[in-house]
């Protein structure tokens, strides 16, 4: 009975973490899309909140790839890493269910 309860708790925790990663990936997508729009003032609401939420994560990947035609593609590494984490969590979640 205790093992069953632990599996249920683990399943809930993994589900919450996976959904958080998906929401964060969506926020990153919005951030990168809005970065292409030149007229956005990042120091007004609601953009500053999005910037403060996503910049610490994106800063981990900045400078890892050289600029290509003046564009920074290091955020793609952030997307790729977060997608891999989501896939890993989903596979663990599926293994726990079955």
Swiss-Prot record:
InterPro entries: CCB3/YggT (IPR003425). It is found in: Plastid, Chloroplast. Transmembrane segments: none annotated. One of its GO terms (cellular component) is membrane. It comes from Galdieria sulphuraria (Red alga). This is Uncharacterized protein ycf19. PANTHER family: PROTEIN COFACTOR ASSEMBLY OF COMPLEX C SUBUNIT B CCB3, CHLOROPLASTIC-RELATED, YLMG HOMOLOG PROTEIN 2, CHLOROPLASTIC. Pfam families: YGGT. Belongs to the ycf19 family. Its main location: plastid. Keywords: Chloroplast, Plastid. One of its GO terms (biological process) is nucleoid organization.
């Amino acid at each position: 009975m205790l093992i069953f309860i632990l599996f249920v708790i683990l399943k809930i925790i993994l589900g919450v973490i996976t959904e958080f990663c998906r929401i964060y990936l969506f926020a990153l997508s919005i951030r990168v899309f809005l970065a292409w729009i030149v007229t956005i003032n990042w120091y007004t609401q609601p953009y500053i909140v999005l910037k403060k939420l996503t910049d610490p994560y994106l800063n981990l990947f900045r400078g890892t790839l050289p600029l290509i035609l003046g564009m920074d593609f290091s955020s793609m590494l952030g997307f790729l890493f977060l997608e891999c984490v989501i896939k890993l969590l989903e596979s663990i979640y599926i293994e726990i269910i079955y």
